Regions:
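A contiguous catalytic/ligand-binding core that recognizes phosphate-bearing ligands
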Residues: 6-7, 16, 29-38
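Phosphate-binding beta-loop-alpha motif at adenosine-nucleotide cofactor sites
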Residues: 58-84, 107, 135-139
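PAPS-dependent sulfotransferases, especially Golgi type II membrane carbohydrate sulfotransferases
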Residues: 20-23, 27, 36-43, 53-57, ...
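Short glycine-/polar-rich loops that comprise or flank the Walker A/P-loop
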Residues: 1-4, 57-61
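Rossmann-fold NAD(P)H-dependent dehydrogenase/reductase core
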Residues: 16, 49-53
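Generic recognition of stable, solvent-exposed alpha-helical segments in well-folded globular domains
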Residues: 7, 51, 71-79, 143, ...
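Conserved phosphate-donor/acceptor-positioning beta-strand/loop module used by diverse small-molecule
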Residues: 4-19, 148
Length: 162
């Protein structure tokens, strides 16, 4: 293709946790089930994530994992610079990283409610949560984990281990 793009992915099981919390806090959510129901739902669940991911995977895009970005933002920054053939001053990069952190954005959201652009969410809903990795471990039971493994095998998703 005649474009360059970055595909930023996060562990799909952590995505399910975040998406579930978002849906449960919408005042007009059409989803009313449990977390286990959510990950199995055709519209919201793991299969939908896999289909979306696979629709981008084979395009000429740079793949960046959220987890790698959190663990070594400097390395990922250099990869992005090289991919787009751009140079950004280190101090500007450092400031961008600081101002993109979940903690920084969460503070802004609390202080100014600027990120509260969703009209149909509960009043105290906070869109930016912790941004922590492996939150799914406290949400997925053994049956959910087996379901996820089966879905990953079905769609040949090998970027993350379960």
């Amino acid at each position: 293709p005649n474009f360059k793009a970055i595909l930023l992915i996060r562990h799909p099981l952590d995505v399910m946790v975040s998406y579930y919390n978002f849906e449960k806090n919408k005042t007009n959510s059409r989803f009313k089930g449990s977390f286990s129901d959510f990950i199995r739902n055709n519209k919201y669940g793991l299969e939908a994530w896999c289909k979306h991911y696979l629709s981008w995977k084979d395009k000429s895009v740079m793949l960046i994992k959220y987890e790698n970005l959190k663990s070594d933002e400097n390395k990922q920054f250099m990869r992005i610079n090289n991919y787009f053939k751009i140079e950004i001053e280190k101090n500007k990069f450092k400031k961008a990283v600081e101002q993109s952190s979940a903690e920084f954005i969460s503070k802004i959201e609390i202080r100014e409610k600027k990120l509260q652009t969703f009209k149909n969410v509960n009043k105290n809903f906070q869109f930016v949560r912790s941004g922590e990795i492996n939150q799914y471990l406290s949400y997925f039971n053994n049956n959910d984990m087996q379901f996820a493994k089966n879905i990953f095998e079905k769609y040949k998703i090998h970027e993350y281990e379960i």
